[in-house]
Design a protein with these regions (language model features):
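Active-site catalytic microenvironments in core metabolic enzymes, especially phosphate/sugar-handling
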Residues: 1-225
Length: 225
């Protein structure tokens, strides 16, 4: 996505890598863990450097992280919306974990027709909202989630957007989805689209990405040998 910042955030492109630590975010705890385990590379989903910092000092959390990475010779690489949208990435893997058929892309990439944000799947067997909630809880090990809609409504078509997906509520509705599964949502978006007949399952940003990231990491391990 044009607004995003992905790739090598901090480090040396020529560095030989023998151990990688996968994380959703580059926190100070993650950097400490990478140092203790001897990982030369931290691979995160969310970029540490989303916008250019005006200063890099120990006065700020961001500055401390960058300085710590450099001091400990740890590289940081982030794959965000590119990892969401690519074929076989987070969106597709979430669909796979939930046991649905391969979906169509909601918002296609202008540079790759097989990539894009969000997926819409047609169910081979109709399910109620409650049945889908139970499926999510068991498949992603989610204890609690927020929903808006009718638990007994029969669902035929589902939109799925990992992470913050409320900007795609309109696309989901246009594509005929009865329900959307996503992460961060806000009151007014949910209230309006519920009125328009869209059931909404907010499973949490972390829950919509971390279990999926673990699954994707298995594919990365296979590729790296």
């Amino acid at each position: 996505e044009g607004f995003d910042n992905v790739g090598l955030m901090v480090g040396d492109r020529e560095k030989n890598i023998t151990k990688i630590l996968l994380a959703l975010d580059c926190t100070e705890e993650v950097i400490k863990e990478a140092k203790e385990m001897g990982a030369e590379l931290i691979l995160t989903h969310h970029p540490l450097l989303f916008r250019k910092p005006s200063t890099i000092t120990t006065d700020t959390l961001l500055g401390r992280k960058i300085i710590s990475l450099i001091k400990n010779d740890i590289n940081l690489y982030s794959a965000h919306t590119n990892w969401d949208s690519v074929k076989g990435g987070l969106n597709d893997t979430l669909v796979e974990i939930l046991g649905f058929n391969e979906g169509i892309i909601m918002d296609k990439s202008p540079v790759d027709s097989q990539a894009g944000i969000g997926r819409v799947v047609e169910l081979t067997k109709e399910m109620t909202v409650l049945e889908i909630i139970n499926l999510i809880k068991s498949s992603l090990d989610v204890k609690n989630l927020r929903y808006a809609g009718d638990l007994n409504e029969v669902i035929k078509k589902i939109a799925i957007v990992n992470g913050s997906g409320q900007d795609f509520f309109g696309d989901a509705k246009k594509l005929g989805a009865d329900l959307i599964i996503t992460g961060d949502t806000t009151y007014h978006f949910v209230s309006d689209y519920k009125e328009m007949g869209l059931n909404i399952l907010d499973i949490g940003h972390f829950n919509s990405e971390w279990p999926v990231l673990i699954k994707v990491s298995e594919k990365v391990k296979e590729r790296l040998g």
